[in-house]
Design a protein with these regions (language model features):
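N-terminal secretory signal peptides that target proteins for export/translocation
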Residues: 1-6
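Gly/Ser/Thr/Pro-rich low-complexity, intrinsically disordered segments
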Residues: 8, 23-253
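Bacterial N-terminal signal peptides
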Residues: 11-20
């Protein structure tokens, strides 16, 4: 309920949720029963999808081993860091289950996601060395990407110029820490310019946001309950087969 009220205070109306009375409470209570909560919101002329883990024992991991829909407990799978021109290497050093793995250097890596146990944070790369040490020591996970919202401020200049120069013909997705400290993956449902996407994140109450690999690498999926059929988040393009690493929300039970 608190998330819905905060959105309404900003003039952002969740799609399919009544804006007054018991109708809003009933609709939101139904959502709260799912391990992975999905909400759709209009921000200006554009529609956004928010996917948020809803119970404390869900974990966020990154992996370079492709998790399939048949794997028990996987609720969300999306591409994470950029893949290199060789279609194998991962952009930036990263940590998988406490193991440091070297990636190629790139100036676009301005931030990182750190996940240890059920704790997730998104930080600037000025903290990278300390975060890598924490991930290795705690058996955790880390990957690097463009930090496109930092401390509630949009930083569109951190998206590669080649992406910024495109017309509004692709969708965008980001891993986010909200103002209340919760984690979310937020995706634009319709096509927009990257600055429109980042402005929308800020209006939705995002404190920190890390870009996720998109374009023809955008394929991913989610489900609200363990064992449900998957809901695809983007078309399966030819480049999907070259995805090299993934951000995964996994249930502990």
């Amino acid at each position: 309920m608190k998330r819905i009220k905060k959105l309404l205070m900003r003039g952002i109306l969740p799609m399919g949720v009544m804006a007054a009375g018991c109708g809003m409470a009933a609709a939101y209570d139904d959502v709260l029963k799912t391990p992975l909560e999905r909400n759709s919101c209009m921000v200006g002329e554009h529609q956004f999808m928010l996917l948020q883990p809803n119970v404390a024992d869900l974990v966020i991991v990154t992996t370079d081993s492709l998790p399939g829909p048949e794997e028990p407990g996987v609720l969300l799978r999306v591409a994470a860091a950029f893949t290199g021109d060789d279609l194998r290497s991962v952009c930036g050093d990263h940590v998988v289950a406490g193991e440091l793995r070297r990636g190629y250097d790139d100036v676009t890596c301005t931030g990182h996601l750190l996940a240890v146990g059920t704790r997730v944070s998104i930080r600037p790369n000025s903290d990278l060395d300390a975060s890598v040490a924490t991930a290795v020591k705690g058996g955790g996970y880390l990957f690097q990407q463009c930090l496109i919202v930092e401390d509630g401020v949009g930083r569109v200049e951190r998206i590669p110029q080649a992406i910024r120069d495109r017309e509004a013909h692709i969708i965008y997705r980001a891993a986010c820490i909200m103002n209340d400290g919760s984690f979310a993956v937020i995706q634009g449902i319709d096509k927009m310019y990257c600055h429109e996407f980042i402005d929308g994140l800020v209006k939705l109450g995002v404190q920190q946001a890390l870009y996720l690999d998109m374009g023809t690498w955008a394929y991913g999926w989610y489900r609200e309950h363990n064992g449900d059929p998957i809901v695809e988040l983007a078309p399966h393009f030819d480049n999907t087969r070259y995805q090299s690493n993934w951000l995964v929300v996994r249930s502990c039970y």
